[in-house]
């Protein structure tokens, strides 16, 4: 398993070591010790979710108040998605920036995002199943969304006509969410997280 920090602080890409033989494949997609060594703290598991989507579905951009905040560890166990993280932390050097990563059932990579980072994805296979571990339980009173098609974010979704839920369709734009005081601040998020080590890959290379 190798962990690589992405361009937004607090976001990591995890590449597992896959062991294949004629029977199939086995892998560790989460390892508490290697994760904590890279990130600087373990993931406090509070809830695990599965999301099944058909091609063209876009979900997001979702985020949780900080505090309490919610970190996520996301992988695709069937099909493929274009997974997107957005820095929603007001005052962050990368505020308003996004990064996209292909998650699928071939590479079986995962993405970790810390508190204050928005999350969304687009299903790019006929059906895609996303599995994610969360550090907090779902509470509709603390969860919010930014419109995934906000022109200020300019996310390059790999679909011509995205399928959105009514909730995501009615979500605020980034500027509206900021003006409404809904976005977390970088300082508040820093107070609830442990600083990450310097950029570089962490983990064993495998046999």
From Swiss-Prot:
Its EC number is 5.1.3.-. GO terms for biological process: dTDP-rhamnose biosynthetic process; novobiocin biosynthetic process; polysaccharide biosynthetic process. It comes from the Bacteria. Keywords: Antibiotic biosynthesis, Isomerase. GO terms for cellular component: cytosol. The record marks 138 as: Participates in a stacking interaction with the thymidine ring of dTDP-4-oxo-6-deoxyglucose. The active site is at residues 62, 132. GO terms for molecular function: dTDP-4-dehydrorhamnose 3,5-epimerase activity; isomerase activity. Pathway: Antibiotic biosynthesis; novobiocin biosynthesis. Substrate binds at residues 23, 28, 47-49, 59, 72, 119, 143, 167. Belongs to the dTDP-4-dehydrorhamnose 3,5-epimerase family. It is unclear whether NovW acts before or after C-methyltransferase NovU in the novobiocin biosynthesis pathway. dTDP-6-deoxy-D-xylo-4-hexulose 3-epimerase that acts together with NovU to catalyze the formation of dTDP-4-keto-6-deoxy-5-C-methyl-L-lyxo-hexose from dTDP-4-keto-6-deoxy-D-glucose in the novobiocin biosynthesis pathway, an aminocoumarin family antibiotic that targets bacterial DNA gyrases. PANTHER family: DTDP-6-DEOXY-D-GLUCOSE-3,5 EPIMERASE (PTHR21047), THYMIDINE DIPHOSPHO-4-KETO-RHAMNOSE 3,5-EPIMERASE (PTHR21047:SF2). This is dTDP-4-dehydrorhamnose 3-epimerase. The gene is novW.
């Amino acid at each position: 398993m190798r962990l690589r920090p992405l361009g937004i602080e607090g976001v990591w890409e995890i590449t597992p070591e896959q062991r294949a033989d004629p029977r199939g494949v086995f892998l560790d997609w989460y390892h508490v010790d290697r994760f904590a060594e890279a990130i600087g703290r373990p993931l406090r598991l509070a809830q695990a979710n599965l999301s099944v989507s058909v091609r063209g579905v876009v979900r997001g951009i979702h985020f949780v108040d900080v505090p309490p905040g919610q970190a996520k560890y996301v992988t695709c166990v069937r099909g493929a998605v274009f997974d997107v993280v957005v820095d929603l932390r007001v005052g962050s050097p990368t505020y308003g920036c996004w990064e996209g990563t292909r998650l699928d059932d071939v590479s079986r990579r995962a993405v970790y995002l810390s508190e204050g980072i928005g999350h969304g994805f687009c299903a790019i296979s006929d059906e895609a199943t996303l599995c994610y571990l969360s550090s907090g339980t779902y509470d509709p009173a603390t969860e919010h969304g930014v419109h995934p098609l906000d022109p200020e974010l300019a996310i390059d979704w790999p679909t011509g006509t995205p399928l959105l839920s009514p909730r995501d369709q009615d979500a605020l734009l980034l500027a509206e969410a900021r003006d409404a005081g809904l976005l977390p601040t970088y300082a508040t998020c820093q107070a609830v997280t442990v600083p990450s080590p310097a950029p570089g890959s962490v983990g064993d290379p495998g046999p």
